[in-house]
Amino acid sequence: MATVKLRKALRMKGEKMKTDSRSLVLQGYVWLMMPALLFLLFWFRWEVALPVAALMVWSFVRLCRPSARESLQTEGYSPVSASRKRLLLMAAAVVAYVMVCGIGGFVTQLPNDHAWRNGVFFDLSRRDWPVAYEGDGAPMLCYYFAFWLPSAVVAKATGLIAAGDAAQVLYAAWGTWIALCFISSMSGGRMLWRVFLVFIGFNAMDVVTAFFFSDESFSVFEDPWAAQLMWLSTTSGRFAASANPVIYNFIYNQGIAVWVFMSLLMHGRRDTGRLMLLFGMLPAFAPIPALAVAPWVAWRLLRGFRQALTVENVAGLLFALLTSFFLLQNNSGSALRRAYPDTPVGEALLLAAAYYALSFGAFVIFIWRYVRRDGLYWSLVAMCVAVSLVGVGKTPDLAWRISLPAVVMTAALVCRRAAETAAMSRGVRCAFVAVLLVGSFSSVWSVVFTLHEESCVWRGERERKYLSMLGRIADPSQPYYNNFVATGDSFYRRHLAPPDIRSRE
């Protein structure tokens, strides 16, 4: 009897665990919908929030029904299969990567965006929702903060910011895991370490674009710990195509959501019956990247208009409209302008086309088989070029953020190609590896920089976590005040905000 049990245990240990694409789709929708529902229920009047929330929940219930199973299985996607040991090791590696990028503040945070991210999370955790402040113009927190809402609930429930920080790590790791599993699913279902390494190291050739487009000068030999060496993707003024570590270090509140969204979109792009539900949740996390996808989504919905008339799409449209009314009151977000007005439009577009050709061109050679007739991919690249003419507030943030969907889709397809290296000829494989290594310079450097900064923490030379903005988000003297607050009257305050917000202003 004992021998039989031992054999059974050994068989179970060697068994592979499988996850089909339906499970991944449901996980992706839960990941996006949890913060969306929290935002809806606490930032809007009950008579507005409850009907839309009910529609969104009903849409998810319809998604879970057995009758929807076939529509969630997409050709070209295989069940993800790996041993329990490999899955656990890769899950641990994902958590470690998220922590090394500074999310949660358990490993050294790099300068200096984390200071404001920590400040937003602190106010969401410590103040009543919607977050309002005292001061002229009745300021209130107005930012795309959906990423932090589940973690803020944990912090509120426990009374511990540290518990919320741990929840941030787990939520970020879960979103990353969903994206990696989708990549594995479209790569034959194999969970490969080389795919994971390409994922964390992907960089859109910023070492090349910085050489041609940046006015700054930096050298690894002159100042090896200059922060610009990992920020190369943001040193070219109006243009940017971020590295994945830059996304995870500085704009993770948007970037991880874009990874989950793009994974779902690439998988279910032909399903117009749920397209607006999926797209409608993105602006609460990442409104600027959502603009990059909007033209393609609009085209697909118009093309399949009859199939698009669904409860799911109505729910997504209503949620997107409510999110837009909230975000449009932001002091910076409502101020669009022409970026670099002294440059003629034609010249600016040529420069943008050259920049993004350098950013993505070397990778497109290897993923050409996937993208040559892919309207989604080329529309995302075209939006990168076109929106380089536009700025928001005082910074070129619109152009910097709008490239995220193109970067993410390129990275996902490059990861898929990395899973096929065994089928490449030796010459193609060597060229592919060379392109990845050249592109990964600042990605590798950001990890090296983090380890250096962590050693500084141990020596007592700096703090691990940026705390300078805790409780100061609504301080008008801080330089990015307008990015995070809304003041004065607005359509949202008059008609959509909960009535009790006036008593807290």
Regions found by a protein language model. Name each.
Residues 101-260:
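Active-site lumenal/periplasmic loops and adjacent helix-entry segments of GT-C-fold
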Residues 38-44, 58-62, 84-112, 172-180, ...:
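Transmembrane signal-anchor helices characteristic of membrane glycosylation enzymes that use polyprenol
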Residues 34-40, 245-246, 264-265, 272-295:
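Membrane-interface alpha helices of multi-pass inner-membrane proteins
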